[in-house]
């Protein structure tokens, strides 16, 4: 609602400027829920100009839109957009309409190691659980690739909820096409190793094979080499981060909370969300959970929205 109020003020200001323009001023312009509308430009033809038929006449003037008219038009556009989002939230069983995130930051914040997660070399890819931001946003990430539920793709696309996927090839290779459809819907695909091992038990070379091998798979199958990596189970050592760096990884996001169909689990003592928190979940279904992927999304989104947060795209900040 705060965003709506800001946009209403912007629309009113634009309309007032239009109303004060003379006959040679610009035509109406305004902002809508999805961006800035284009302004038309209406000039005045000179008096006595000969029309094509030879009779002198003045071109008709476009009447400038009044402030109240522009505001009414904006409110109607906003009302329709909100009604559509409300209908989709109801369709998918959400208790509230998800909040919209702010525009992405013009400059991405500097990512550093979370305190206590360092391995002694500050030049290695940083391990973190929260993105440094004052925006009331969190980031939804989904790991591994075991469950390939088409309902998840429809739900997230219709609700326009951004998320990121961290994939392991031993699960993804059962249906590479599912994750290509996900990518085509705007989801970024990242590295979660080839076979999902406990990384600290492996040598540097073995860890490098797991990470670089998955880099190669994702690049070959999906056309882009990831820069983000999440170690299986969140476990890593200095060799893990050295191997990740040598495979082209820039950062290692872990998580602050984990979402299930029936609950949230929390890393922090206050059991709450904070600006920039990363939320983990998994590609799972009724075989592993008491619910489906859609049930998990409903529970997570209700929690996130009720606590006053929007879901933003991780790659816009990292």
Each PLM stretch: what is its role?
Residues 23, 28, 41-63:
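Intrinsically disordered, low-complexity repeat/linker tracts enriched for polar/charged residues
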Residues 138-142, 163-167, 188-191, 227-230, ...:
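Structural recognition of the beta-strand scaffold that forms the well-ordered cores
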Residues 235, 240-272, 309-316:
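His/Asp/Glu-enriched short active-site or ligand-binding loop at hydrolase and phosphoryl-transfer sites
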Residues 124-133, 173, 291-318:
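C-terminal domain-boundary segment and adjacent tail
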Residues 157, 161-162, 188, 197, ...:
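CE4/NodB-like, metal-dependent polysaccharide N-deacetylase domain
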Residues 145-148, 167-175, 198-205, 230-236, ...:
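Acidic-and-aromatic substrate-binding clefts and catalytic sites of carbohydrate-active enzymes
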Residues 97-191, 195-198, 217:
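Active-site beta->alpha N-cap acidic-glycine motif
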Residues 1-36, 58:
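Secretory targeting and sorting signals
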């Amino acid at each position: 609602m705060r965003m709506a109020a800001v946009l209403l003020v912007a629309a009113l200001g634009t309309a007032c400027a239009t109303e004060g323009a003379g006959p040679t001023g610009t035509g109406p312009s305004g902002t809508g829920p999805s961006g800035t509308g284009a302004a038309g430009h209406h000039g005045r033809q000179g008096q006595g100009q000969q029309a094509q038929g030879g009779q002198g006449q003045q071109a008709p003037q476009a009447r400038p839109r009044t402030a109240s008219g522009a505001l009414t038009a904006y409110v109607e556009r906003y009302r329709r957009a909100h009604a559509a989002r409300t209908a989709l939230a109801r369709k998918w069983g959400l208790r509230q309409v998800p909040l919209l995130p702010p525009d992405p930051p013009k400059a991405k914040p500097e990512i550093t190691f979370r305190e206590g997660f360092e391995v002694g070399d500050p030049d290695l890819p940083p391990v973190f659980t929260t993105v440094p931001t004052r925006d009331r946003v969190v980031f939804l990430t989904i790991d591994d690739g075991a469950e390939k539920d088409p309902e998840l793709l429809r739900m997230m696309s219709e609700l326009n909820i951004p998320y990121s996927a961290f994939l392991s090839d031993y699960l993804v290779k059962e249906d590479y096409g599912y994750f290509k459809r996900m990518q085509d819907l705007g989801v970024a695909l990242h590295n979660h190793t080839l076979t999902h091992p406990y990384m600290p038990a492996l040598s540097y070379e073995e860890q490098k094979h797991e990470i670089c091998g998955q880099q190669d798979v994702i690049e070959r199958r999906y056309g882009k080499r990831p820069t983000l990596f999440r170690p299986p189970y969140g476990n890593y050592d200095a060799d893990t981060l050295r191997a990740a760096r040598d495979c082209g990884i820039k950062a290692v996001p872990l998580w602050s909370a984990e979402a299930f169909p029936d609950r949230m689990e929390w890393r922090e003592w206050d059991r709450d969300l904070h600006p920039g928190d990363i939320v983990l979940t998994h590609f799972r279904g009724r075989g592993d959970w008491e619910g489906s992927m859609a049930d998990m999304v409903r529970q997570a989104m209700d929690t996130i929205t009720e606590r006053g947060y929007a879901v933003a795209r991780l790659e816009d900040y990292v």
